[in-house]
């Protein structure tokens, strides 16, 4: 049996605090991220698209659209329950940072777009459930879990692409990033099924236990991969 989950507002606060502490961003970068709006992201995407047209390297940015659509609906619903004006900046900001950073490396840029498409296609479209959130605390807690899942993906990706040597590291860490995408997509698929059932206490406990187990399993795999990479470096030296 999993422990009692935190109240939704507390879950958001802890997720944001963890991201700020572990992302490896400078204070200036964090300030920019925390003030990023969807409009800012869309302007950056338009600039990237224009540049790609000029260089004849158009890379189908519409792959990002399912994710953006789902997160827009998320924003509409979550504003009813959480008094955090900059919450979605921690979605739009990392997307902008990651795509701007990798826009000149086609393989990496495409991998990120594919990842966002996979995540976006599994996200529940929340407006159809909005009448249930107000009266169902377990649905509200599931909303917080969705944000945590997306932010965990962004944390791992930002940690990688913030490093100066990310172009060299990408191939060594690509499979780990793909696994994280799949992990988040699977979790969001469970969120969607959970919301369709309109969430009883027993269902929430089962859902939360499964989510905790999968997160622990993924963390163990990450640790094993780091050990393997470290040993390979030592052998090379």
Task: Give each language-model segment a name.
Residues 3-6, 118, 127, 138-237:
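Regulatory helix-to-disordered linker/tail regions at the edges of structured cores
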Residues 26-30, 34, 53, 57-60, ...:
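Alpha-helical rod/repeat scaffolding segments in eukaryotic adaptors/tethers
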Residues 62, 83-86, 114, 141, ...:
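Eukaryote-biased feature marking scaffold/signaling PDZ-domain proteins and nuclear chromatin regulators
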Residues 62-111:
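Membrane-inserting effector segments that mediate pore formation, membrane fusion
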Residues 76-82, 102-105, 130-141, 199:
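Acidic, serine/threonine- and proline-rich low-complexity regulatory regions
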Residues 102-127:
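Membrane-engaging insertion elements
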